[in-house]
C-alpha cells in the first residue's frame, strides 16, 4: 500500500493538522507494516502558484521551455506521479480565511490535469483517479456547524477529489482550536476518537 501524506499548514511543529496527519499515517502503517509512505510538505516545498509563465508546464507542447519552466515541469511530474501511485492520501487541510491554504490550491493545480487525472467527454468530465482512499484532516479555529456555508475548505477538497473520480473520502475534524483551552481540548479529543475509528479492520483490509 502506498500512502501519500500531504501537509499544508504554515505552523510547522505548532500545527494541529500536521500532528494529526502524522497520527493517521502512523496508525495506517501499524495496521499495514509493508506500507510505503511519502510525505509532501507544501509549506517547505511550496508549488509555484498558477501564472501565465507556468501554463506551458501544465499542458501543450513541451518544446522550447525555459530552464525555469523545465524545472517546474519536473516538479509537476513528481507530484503527479506521487498522487497517481498513492492508494491512500492523508491530507491536512487547515482553514485559512474560509478556504484552503494557497499552497494546497497550487498543488491541486498541478495534479488536476486533463487527460491525466480527468477527461472531458460528450457527457461531461470523468475522473481518472478513482480507486483511492482519501482521509482529510480538517482543522479550524471555530466550531463547524452542519451545512455551514462557510465550510469552504472542506467543500473545496471534496469537490476536487470527487471530480478526479475519488469517492472514498473520510474526514477527521479538529475544530474550535482558537476558542480557548476547553474548546481546543474537546476538538482534539474528538479528532483522536475519529482517528481511532479509522482502524476498522474492514476498511484497512484492502
From Swiss-Prot:
What are the GO MF terms of this UniProt record? electron transfer activity; FMN binding; oxidoreductase activity, acting on NAD(P)H as acceptor; oxidoreductase activity, acting on NAD(P)H, quinone or similar compound as acceptor
UniProt EC number: 1.6.5.-, 1.7.1.17
Membrane spanning stretches: none
Positions bound to FMN: 9, 15-17, 139-142
Write out the catalysed reaction.
Answer: 2 a quinone + NADH + H(+) = 2 a 1,4-benzosemiquinone + NAD(+); N,N-dimethyl-1,4-phenylenediamine + anthranilate + 2 NAD(+) = 2-(4-dimethylaminophenyl)diazenylbenzoate + 2 NADH + 2 H(+)
Keyword Nuclease listed? no
User: Transcription regulation as a keyword?
Assistant: no
A Pfam cross-reference name = Flavodoxin_2
What binding details are noted for the cofactor? Answer: Binds 1 FMN per subunit.
Its needed co-factors are: FMN
Q: Which keywords accompany this UniProt record? A: Flavoprotein, FMN, NAD, Oxidoreductase
For this protein, the record's SUPFAM superfamilies field holds: Flavoproteins
Matching HAMAP family, A to Z? Azoreductase_type1
**Oligomeric form and interacting partners:** Homodimer.
Output the PANTHER family linked to this UniProt entry. FMN-DEPENDENT NADH-AZOREDUCTASE 1, FMN-DEPENDENT NADH:QUINONE OXIDOREDUCTASE
Query: Per the similarity annotation, which family is this?
Result: Belongs to the azoreductase type 1 family.
Primary role? Quinone reductase that provides resistance to thiol-specific stress caused by electrophilic quinones. Also exhibits azoreductase activity. Catalyzes the reductive cleavage of the azo bond in aromatic azo compounds to the corresponding amines.
The entry's protein name is FMN-dependent NADH:quinone oxidoreductase
Its source organism is Cupriavidus necator (strain ATCC 17699 / DSM 428 / KCTC 22496 / NCIMB 10442 / H16 / Stanier 337)
Lineage of the organism: Bacteria, Pseudomonadati, Pseudomonadota, Betaproteobacteria, Burkholderiales
- The gene name on file is azoR
Amino acid at each position: 500500500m502506498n500512502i501519500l501524506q500531504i501537509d499544508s499548514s504554515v505552523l510547522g511543529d505548532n500545527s494541529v493538522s500536521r500532528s494529526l496527519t502524522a497520527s493517521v499515517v502512523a496508525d495506517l502503517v501499524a495496521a499495514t507494516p509493508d506500507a510505503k509512505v511519502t510525505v509532501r510538505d507544501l509549506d517547505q516545498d511550496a508549488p509555484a502558484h498558477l501564472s501565465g509563465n507556468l501554463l506551458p508546464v501544465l499542458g501543450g507542447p513541451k518544446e522550447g521551455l525555459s530552464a525555469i519552466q523545465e524545472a517546474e515541469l519536473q516538479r509537476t511530474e513528481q507530484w503527479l506521479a506521487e498522487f497517481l501511485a498513492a492508494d491512500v492520501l492523508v491530507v491536512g487541510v487547515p482553514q485559512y480565511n474560509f478556504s484552503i491554504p494557497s499552497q494546497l490550491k497550487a498543488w491541486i493545480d498541478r495534479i488536476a490535469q486533463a487527460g491525466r487525472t480527468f477527461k472531458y467527454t460528450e457527457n461531461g468530465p470523468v475522473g481518472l483517479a478513482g480507486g483511492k482512499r482519501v482521509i482529510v484532516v480538517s482543522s479550524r479555529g471555530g466550531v463547524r456547524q452542519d451545512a455551514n456555508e462557510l465550510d469552504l475548505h472542506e467543500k473545496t477538497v471534496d469537490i476536487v477529489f470527487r471530480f478526479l473520480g475519488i469517492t472514498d473520502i473520510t474526514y477527521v475534524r479538529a475544530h474550535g482550536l482558537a476558542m480557548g483551552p476547553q474548546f481546543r481540548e474537546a476538538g482534539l479529543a474528538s479528532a483522536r476518537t475519529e482517528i481511532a475509528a479509522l482502524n476498522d479492520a474492514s476498511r484497512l483490509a484492502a
